[in-house]
Amino acid sequence: MKSLREEFDFPIFLNADHTHSRAGAEEVAKAGFDSIVFDLSALPLEQNVRQTREAVAALKAIQPSMLVEGEIGDIGSGSEIHEAMPDPSQRLTTPEEARQFVEETGIDILAPAVGSRHGMSRSMVRGESKQHLNIERIAAIKAATGVPLTLHGGSGTEDEDFRRAIAAGITIVHINTELRVAWRRSLEDSLAAKPDEVVPYKILPPVVESVREVVKSRLRLFSNAEAVAR
């Protein structure tokens, strides 16, 4: 990826998502990644603060320009399809926790829990329901910290919630499960349409195109929302 960026002078950004150990994070820094999500959100807050602070110092010593993102709160894990999504309202990051975490760790970017969850419910996949975000909490956390905020677990979120979240302070949005659902559905359709076909390059083009269309639609939504927020 670095070679492609240099060869074509294209702004490819290398991010290591959800790295859970100091050793793994240091490997990423030495490899020249632009940013890392150092995720110890499963730990109690005080342990998360202490270990993230130590990791930030170590990573900046290796690569001073590297952006370090920290995570607090519960947004689940894994790109899975669930029968139902748990109620996120009891697991939201508070503005006080966010301020403490940012001030005591020195992170560049914060990923708080604001109503989203990794994965999607079956009803979301069927288009029967949408995920909703706590916009007021996003605004309060942004005001309390002043740092860029990342939304993880964005798949299945209502479009208007994305627009309002970006206006309230979200800078980065992560989406994965939506892409995988599009890939799976299109692959099933392609195989059904050509049951005797065994050549991958004859099966996969519509699959790749279906994922591309989801990416394009999300980029349009986020870019327009960002322009309005400005």
Model-predicted regions and their roles:
Residues 1-11, 18-145, 159-175, 181, ...:
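Alpha/beta enzyme core
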Residues 151-153:
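Thr-Gly-centered strand-to-loop micro-motif
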Residues 211-215, 225:
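Acidic, glycine-enriched catalytic cores built around paired aspartates
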